[in-house]
Amino acid sequence: MQDIKVAVDAVIFGYFDKQDLQLLLIKRKIEPFKGGWALPGGLVLDDENLDDAVKRELHEEAGIKPDFLEQLYTFGNVGRDPRNRVVSVAYLGLVNPSYHELFADSDAEDAQWFSVNRLPSLAFDHKNIIDIALKRLRTKLQYQPIGFNLLNEEFPFSDLENLYRTIIGREIDRRNFRKKIMSYGLLNETNNIKKEGSGRPGKLFTFNQEKYEELEKEGFYFEIK
């Protein structure tokens, strides 16, 4: 008789102002890979839905509740877990770290943010899961403005530019980027400004969720050059 366990793993990205894209990792308190870094996650309880399981694990192991969370992919290669045959349903999530204080508990010894460009050695097949999640994130930016989940409620346009440039990993045509974003009506201009250094004060914007929902029904593709 087969004995296959079902688990969930969460790839949670965060963005600190003008820094690299960050990834949430936990330090394992138990074997296997005790003391090693891994994605938050664990086995699904018998009476638990998958979505509830990943939210529980994130709360228990890191003390956070993502602003955006969706199923990513299912991983089930033989031998991916040395203990049992384990099939893991991975999730992709986004949080604004400014609003979330990490708190490790349960079977996590610690929880920290790491730059996606400087990750430590990882347990299980979690490096592969992260690579697939990063590709999905970069693709989704082309048709769904999920990046706004990583910004403050009010933000200067330069922060949005920096975020997109950081996630896709290359320079963008700033003039074309601004023109496209503004033409879609996805931003509401506020009466507030933000002054940084000796430069001109920047106007602050908010994300227009209603406008996005209208565009989503019509179908649109936001190509970043």
Task: Mark where each language-model region is.
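RNA substrate-recognition surfaces in RNA-acting enzymes
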Residues: I172-K203
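Short histidine-centered catalytic/ligand-binding loop motif
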Residues: L39-D47, N149-L150
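NUDIX/MutT-family hydrolases
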Residues: L92, L102-R136, L150-S158, N176-G185, ...
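N-terminal strand-loop-strand
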Residues: M1-W37
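Short helix-coil junctions and helix-kink-helix linkers
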Residues: N162-E171
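Core subunits and conserved enzymes of cellular information-processing
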Residues: Y15-L23, D51-K55, H59-G63, L69, ...
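Active-site segment of metal-dependent pyrophosphate-handling enzymes
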Residues: I4-V6, D52-K55, H59-L102, N117-R118, ...
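Long, intrinsically disordered, low-complexity Ser/Thr/Pro-rich regulatory/activation regions
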Residues: I193-K225
